[in-house]
Amino acid sequence: MNVVVDTHTHTLASGHAYSTIIENARSAQNKGLKLLCTTDHAPEMPGAPHYWYFNNQRILPRFLHQVGILRGVEANILNVKGEIDLPSSSDQHLDWVIASFHEPVFAPASEAEHTAALLNVIKSGRIDVLGHSGNPNYPFDIERVLQCAKEHNVAIEVNNTSLTGKSRKGSDVRCDKIVEIGKEVGVYFTTGSDAHFCEEIARLELAIALLEKYEISEDKIITTSTSRFLNFLLLRGKPIIPEFDSLY
């Protein structure tokens, strides 16, 4: 499987990452990526930037080191209502919105509460993908949530860092189940390194191996071509990005 998009990466702006967007783009180029989503942590995460930072991504060039740059965020799910920590006025400035649970923002609660939060954030229409949902601290009704994601064209991330065991220990078992059920349901999958240092960009081997284990069709893995990824954004109702015209 050839993956040409990394949909989950962080820069210095996240507060606990160690590279600039230029360094990330250079690493992406060296590793053969065509598109890179820059997705710093949203404001409620300790050390994260103000929402102006995300709005101001409109000044970023569409290409850095010949890699297309998608302007994104890793938003925090705040509550069972599925609210996220950016104002709706920010949506117009963002190409790619990940929604994730993080312990400092949403304290682990019950399976019912986690499920409600995920269903509601999907139904909000404000997010494109659920991030690192295999975290064992946040059990949820996998089948219900994935069915809802399918109905609303929200992708499910396979997070490589979760599978390494270096973060969110114990995620591998739940990630395996999520991919297994996701295949049955027919969701779209995406692959994210969750890089917090430029050398981790495009480190997706474990995510790819898990998708291959369940023989997920490449037309359901939106990071396997620029066309699949960009047309998924169109499916989500995002406008065409003119600078990427030749990549659709």
Swiss-Prot record:
GO biological process, one term: bacterial-type flagellum-dependent swarming motility
Binding site for Zn(2+) 3: 74, 102, 132
Protein EC: 3.1.3.-
Cofactor mode of binding and number, as noted: Binds 3 Zn(2+) ions per subunit.
UniProt-listed SUPFAM superfamilies: PHP domain-like
Gene3D superfamilies assigned: Metal-dependent hydrolases (3.20.20.140)
Keywords annotated in UniProt: Hydrolase, Metal-binding, Zinc
A GO term, aspect molecular function: phosphatase activity
InterPro entries the record matches: Phosphatase_YcdX_put (IPR023710), PHP_dom (IPR004013), PHP_phosphatase (IPR050243), Pol/His_phosphatase_N (IPR003141), Pol/histidinol_Pase-like (IPR016195)
Positions contributing to Zn(2+) 1 binding: 8, 10, 74, 194
Keyword Phosphoprotein: no
UniProt entry tagged with the keyword Metal-binding: yes
Signal peptide (UniProt feature, chain positions): none
Requisite cofactors: Zn(2+)
Domain of life, source organism: Bacteria
GO cellular component annotations of the record: cytosol
Annotated binding of Zn(2+) 2, by residue: 16, 41, 196
PANTHER family: PHOSPHATASE YCDX-RELATED
HAMAP family, A to Z: YcdX_phosphat (MF_01561)
UniProt record similarity statement: Belongs to the PHP family.
Entry protein name: Probable phosphatase VF_A0065
Organism expressing this protein natively: Aliivibrio fischeri (strain ATCC 700601 / ES114)
